[in-house]
C-alpha cells in the first residue's frame, strides 16, 4: 500500500527546521502504519512505544524533564536501540498523555538530534484543551483517508494513477482512460479511503469483509463518543452522527438541528457537534455571504453543512448496499448526490489550506456547493452527479460578483474541458483539482493575450 503522505514525512526528516512531529488523524486512518513504514524506508531502525499497550512507560515522562534520562529509561525498559538522527522514535497513542506531549518542548530545545513522531486517536480533542501542547515547539501533519489516487495505487492501477498525474493540458480524456477511471471511482465510493476496507477489496475482493471493516470502524467511532468529558453529551453526539445521512439527503443540505431531534436547539447540541468537528470525524462547511478575503470574515456562523470524514463510511452509515456499484450511475446520484458531494469535499480539503465554504441566497433560491480559496483567489465550485449538466447557480454567482471570479469550476461525469470560464473536471480527477485550475487559468490567460 502506498500513502502519498510519506513524501511529506521525508521532507520533514530532511528539513533543517525539523521539530518533533505530531501526526493527527482519525482512528484507523493509518497513522501507525505510515510512521512504521516511514521508519522502515528511511531510517536504520525504528523505536516504537505505544502508551496504550504499555501504560507504565508514561512514568518516565512524569518524573523528569531530562530527555536523555527519558530515552535511557525507555531503552532499558524496552530493549530498543535509539541512535540520534538514525532512529525514528515513534510515540503512539499519546492522546491521554499530556506529559508526553509537553515533553516535545524539551526534545525540540535540548535534543533536536532525535527524530520523534507522535500519533494518537482523538488528538484533535486532546490538543483543543488549554496547555496541552508546547506552542511553536512541534510540527503538525494531518493524515486523511486514502485519496482516489491512493486507491488506484492500492488496486494495482499504477498506469491510471500515473496518467492522471501526467495531465498537463485541458483537453478531453480519451475513452481508454475515461471509462475505467469512471468504474474505479464507483468502487471507491463503495470502499471509501480507510485502509482496512480498501485492503479487503484490493487484496481479497471480499465484499463481506469490506463491509464488516467499515462497520467495525463506525462502531469504534461510536464507542469513542463516550469519551467526552461530559457524559451527558454522549447521546447528543450519537444522535448528530446518525442524523448525517438524513441531513445530506435533503435538497437543501444546510444542517438543521430539528433533523437530529424534534424540538432540538443549537445551544443544546453545539458542544456535541463541536466534539465531532474537533475529532475530525466530520467537516463543517460554513455559508459564505460573499467571495471575499479573508474568507472567515464573510462566514455566516448560523448556517453550515456537515460532511463525514470518508465517503465509504457515509455509504455504510446510510446503509446503501454495495450492489449499487453495478447499477449505472446510482452511486453518484443516490440521496441527492450526497456521496458525490462528500467525496469532492474530501479531495478539496486535502489540496487547499483554507476549509471550503458554500454560498446560497433565497428568493429566488440559488446555491453554489463550495467556495475554494487558491492563493488570493476565490473559485465557486458546483458538484453534479450526472453528465450533460447546466450550472444555473454558477451563472448567477458570476452575475452577482463579476469582478471577483476568474474561473468557475464544475465537477461532473462530463469530460475534462474549459468552456469560456467554466472548467469542467471529471469526478475521477478531483484529486488533481488544484493542478487543473492552474492549467485552466494559464490557458484562459493565453487566449486572452492572443486577442490583442
Name each region found by the language model:
Residues 153-346, 356-363:
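Interdomain hinge/linker elements that couple catalytic modules in large macromolecular machines
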Residues 13-21, 28, 37-41, 271-452:
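A cross-kingdom feature that marks ATP-driven nucleic-acid transaction machinery
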Residues 90, 115-121, 142:
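Structural recognition of the conserved hydrophobic beta-strand(s) that form the central parallel beta-sheet
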Residues 124-140, 152-157:
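Short regulatory helix/loop adjacent to the ATP-binding pocket of P-loop NTPases
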Residues 53-84:
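Short glycine-rich substrate-engagement loop in P-loop NTPases that contacts/grips substrate
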Residues 31:
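Conserved lysine of the Walker
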Residues 82-99:
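Conserved P-loop NTPase "ATPase switch" module shared by AAA+ and STAND
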Amino acid at each position: 500500500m502506498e500513502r502519498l503522505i510519506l513524501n511529506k514525512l521525508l521532507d520533514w526528516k530532511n528539513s533543517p527546521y525539523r521539530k518533533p512531529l505530531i501526526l493527527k488523524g482519525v482512528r484507523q486512518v493509518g497513522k501507525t502504519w505510515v510512521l512504521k513504514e516511514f521508519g522502515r524506508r528511511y531510517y536504520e531502525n525504528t523505536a516504537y512505544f505505544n502508551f496504550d499497550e504499555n501504560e507504565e512507560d508514561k512514568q518516565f515522562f512524569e518524573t523528569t524533564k531530562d530527555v536523555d534520562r527519558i530515552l535511557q529509561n525507555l531503552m532499558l525498559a524496552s530493549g530498543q536501540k535509539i541512535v540520534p538522527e538514525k532512529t525514528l522514535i515513534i510515540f503512539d497513542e499519546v492522546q491521554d498523555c499530556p506529559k508526553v506531549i509537553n515533553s516535545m518542548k524539551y526534545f525540540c530545545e535540548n535534543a533536536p538530534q532525535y527524530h520523534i513522531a507522535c500519533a494518537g486517536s482523538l488528538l484533535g480533542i486532546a490538543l483543543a484543551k488549554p496547555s496541552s501542547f508546547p506552542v511553536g515547539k512541534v510540527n503538525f501533519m494531518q493524515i486523511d483517508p486514502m485519496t482516489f489516487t491512493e486507491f488506484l495505487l492500492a488496486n494495482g492501477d499504477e498506469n491510471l494513477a500515473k496518467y492522471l498525474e501526467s495531465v498537463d493540458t485541458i483537453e478531453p480524456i480519451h475513452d481508454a482512460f475515461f471509462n475505467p477511471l469512471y468504474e474505479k471511482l464507483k468502487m471507491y465510493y463503495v470502499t471509501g479511503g480507510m485502509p482496512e476496507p480498501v485492503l479487503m477489496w484490493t487484496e481479497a475482493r471480499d465484499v463481506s469483509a469490506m463491509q464488516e471493516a467499515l462497520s467495525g470502524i463506525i462502531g469504534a467511532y461510536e464507542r469513542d463518543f463516550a469519551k467526552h468529558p461530559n457524559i451527558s453529551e454522549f447521546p447528543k453526539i450519537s444522535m448528530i452522527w446518525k442524523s448525517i445521512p438524513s441531513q445530506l439527503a435533503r435538497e437543501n443540505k444546510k444542517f438543521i438541528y430539528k433533523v437530529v431531534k424534534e424540538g432540538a436547539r443549537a445551544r443544546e447540541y453545539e458542544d456535541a457537534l463541536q466534539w465531532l468537528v474537533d475529532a475530525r470525524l466530520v467537516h463543517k462547511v460554513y455559508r459564505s455571504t460573499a467571495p471575499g478575503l479573508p474568507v472567515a470574515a464573510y462566514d455566516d456562523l448560523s448556517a453550515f453543512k456537515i460532511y463525514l470524514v470518508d465517503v465509504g463510511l457515509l455509504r455504510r452509515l446510510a446503509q446503501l448496499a454495495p450492489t449499487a456499484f453495478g447499477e449505472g450511475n446510482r452511486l453518484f446520484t443516490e440521496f441527492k448526490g450526497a456521496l458525490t458531494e462528500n467525496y469532492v469535499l474530501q479531495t478539496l480539503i486535502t489540496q487547499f489550506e483554507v476549509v471550503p465554504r458554500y454560498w446560497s441566497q433565497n428568493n429566488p433560491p440559488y446555491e453554489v456547493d463550495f467556495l475554494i480559496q487558491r492563493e488570493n483567489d476565490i473559485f465557486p465550485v458546483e458538484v453534479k452527479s450526472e453528465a450533460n449538466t447546466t450550472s444555473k447557480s454558477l451563472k448567477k454567482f458570476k452575475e452577482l460578483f463579476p469582478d471577483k471570479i476568474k474561473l468557475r469550476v464544475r465537477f461532473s461525469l462530463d469530460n475534462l474541458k474549459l468552456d469560456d470560464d467554466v472548467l469542467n473536471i471529471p469526478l475521477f480527477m478531483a484529486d488533481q483539482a488544484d493542478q487543473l485550475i492552474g492549467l485552466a487559468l494559464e490557458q484562459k490567460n493565453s487566449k486572452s493575450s492572443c486577442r490583442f
